[in-house]
From Swiss-Prot:
Residues 82-177 are annotated as: Important for cytoskeleton localization. Coiled coil: none annotated. It holds the Pfam family Rota_NS53. GO terms for biological process: symbiont-mediated suppression of host cytoplasmic pattern recognition receptor signaling pathway via inhibition of IRF3 activity; symbiont-mediated suppression of host cytoplasmic pattern recognition receptor signaling pathway via inhibition of IRF7 activity. Residues 42-79 are annotated as: Zinc-binding domain. It is found in: Host cytoplasm, Host cytoskeleton. Belongs to the rotavirus NSP1 family. This is Non-structural protein 1. Residues 1-81 are annotated as: RNA-binding. HAMAP family: ROTA_NSP1. It comes from Rotavirus A (strain RVA/SA11-Both/G3P5B[2]) (RV-A). InterPro entries: Rotavirus_NSP1 (IPR002148). The integrity of the zinc-binding domain in NSP1 is important for degradation of host IRF3.
Length: 495
């Protein structure tokens, strides 16, 4: 069966446009790079291989050969991978453009066949090449595509020669077939017309073609934060915020949509060549503040959390405790977003003040029934189980009933940050000494959402943005977040 790699290798000699479009990494020298231990189709050479992460989108979709070309389907340079990429929604006109792309880049006619016969080394006898010499001429046109689902309305489809579905559940895409959205008979006629130029004995490949063109579609996979690699994440030790490096091939030429790009492919090939010749490999540094990272960090925080702090007598913040084996968490918070650190300090301080105001406890080495609930409370932040967990924590503080309402005391001294936060949340001039469940819950929710408005957070990293969006955000100054650096009085915070 013909492979996409073979077709790119031989067809790159036909035209000046092909020399640039068909230059894929799989036909060059292999450079050693780490892989993600994920088996799947490389989207650039359409081969089954161990995938490694792409520097443009941080998703594993290229092999160790093709990754050295540094191409991503989200680039705006019109290379072959970009030309095979179509954004949702799929229309019949877009599918026709994909078919025209194959006919332009990989034509099959008498002139092309004769040229390839002259180009292939014959040595002693053509019989030695009875199978090999024409392999690249048997490339069928299929409408199979690798589908990336970022959300319900943000989907990308990368068309190529995929001979079967993806078996690895960790691959970020799924193979779908759009033959029903086009026209089965019309696509068959296009392929029969292409193959009619080949010798009769080669037309038996039609049976294999039908198997590929009728490949059933797989159920789309929703991409989550865990699918993105950590290799492109950069932690800014100065601002204490995570960021992500995004590399894209950027050209000054712009197209309104895919249809205009394919129109230039047919009518103005020199424009595409000029765009590829003048493109620049550009680095974008973007913030990594998204809901996926927030949930991952909250999960890690709950795992490393030291709930013994709520029974301790430490005067400092929970994140500053360093020499207490029951409360030390500084090793984890040293390289974490300062907003998470501030939230952890306020939350633990508030629960500590409430708990010690109502329950007779010793110090941080004592064993309390509330400890497991503290971890559960952190894990339940920004989830639907938050209200239930807050109520359980409240009930473990020995509330008393006053006029039919359960209340707890708040009589310990508060630090200035927590004092201002409670005043702002309850909208009062002085802190009450008695809290009911609604007030307690409001304070906990206010502390957790002090720095994060979940409704406005993106679900996935900025690396899923198109190159045009990244350029626009960079020019407007919204690509990175700007915060005032929190300066602590503790010398340990500056380490």
């Amino acid at each position: 069966m013909a492979t996409f790699k073979d077709a790119c290798f031989h067809y790159r000699r036909l035209t000046a446009l092909n020399r640039r479009l068909c230059n894929i990494g799989a036909n060059s020298i292999c450079m050693p790079v780490p892989d993600e231990k994920i088996k799947g189709w490389c989207l650039e050479c359409c081969q089954i291989a161990d995938l490694t992460h792409c520097y443009g989108c941080s998703l594993p979709h290229v092999c160790k050969w093709c990754v050295q070309n540094r191409r991503c389907f989200l680039d705006n340079e019109p290379h072959l991978l970009k030309l095979r990429t179509v954004k949702h929604p799929i229309t019949k006109d877009k599918l026709q453009c994909i078919i025209d792309l194959y006919n332009i880049i990989f034509p099959i006619n008498d002139k092309v066949i004769r040229k390839f016969e002259r180009m292939i080394k014959q040595r002693k006898c053509r019989n030695q090449y009875k199978i090999e010499w024409y392999n690249h001429l048997l490339l069928p046109i299929t409408l199979n595509a690798a589908a990336f689902k970022f959300d319900e309305n943000n989907l990308y489809y990368v068309f190529g020669l995929y001979e079967k579905s993806v078996s690895d559940i960790y691959a970020p895409y799924r193979i779908v077939n759009f033959i029903n959205e086009f026209d089965k008979l019309l696509l068959d006629d296009i392929n029969f017309t292409r193959m009619s130029n080949l010798p009769i004995e080669l037309r038996t490949i039609m049976q294999e073609y039908f198997q590929l063109s009728r490949l059933p579609s797989s159920k789309l996979k929703q991409i989550y934060f865990s699918d993105f690699t950590k290799e492109t994440v950069i932690f800014n030790t100065y601002t204490k915020t995570p960021g992500r490096s995004i590399y894209r091939n950027v050209t000054e030429f712009n197209w309104r949509d895919e249809l205009e790009l394919y129109s230039d492919l047919k009518n103005d090939k020199n424009k595409l060549i000029a765009a590829m010749m003048t493109s620049k490999y550009t680095r974008f540094y973007a913030h990594d503040n998204n809901f996926g990272r927030l949930k991952m960090t909250i999960f890690e925080l709950g795992h490393h959390c030291q709930p013994n702090y709520v029974a301790s007598n430490h005067p400092g913040n929970a994140s500053d405790i360093q020499y207490c084996k029951w409360c030390n968490i500084k090793y984890f918070l040293s390289k974490i977003d300062w907003r998470i650190r501030d939230m952890y300090n306020l939350l633990m301080e508030f629960i500590k003040d409430c708990y010690k105001s109502n329950v007779n406890v010793g110090h941080c080495s004592s064993v309390e029934n509330i400890y497991p609930l503290i971890k559960r409370l952190i894990w339940s932040l920004f989830t639907n189980h938050m209200d239930q967990t807050i109520e359980e924590v409240f009930n473990h503080m020995s509330p008393v009933s006053v006029e039919g309402t359960n209340v707890i005391m708040l009589i310990l001294g508060l630090n200035i940050s927590l004092y201002n936060e409670i005043k702002r949340t309850l909208n009062v001039d002085s802190i009450p000494m008695v809290l009911n469940l609604n007030e307690f819950s409001s304070i906990v929710k206010s502390i957790s959402s002090k720095w994060y408005n979940v409704d406005e957070l993106d679900k996935l990293p900025m690396s899923i943005k198109s190159t045009e969006e990244l350029i626009e955000m960079k020019n407007s100054g919204t690509l990175t977040e700007e915060f005032e650096l929190l300066i602590s009085n503790s010398e340990d915070d500056n380490e």
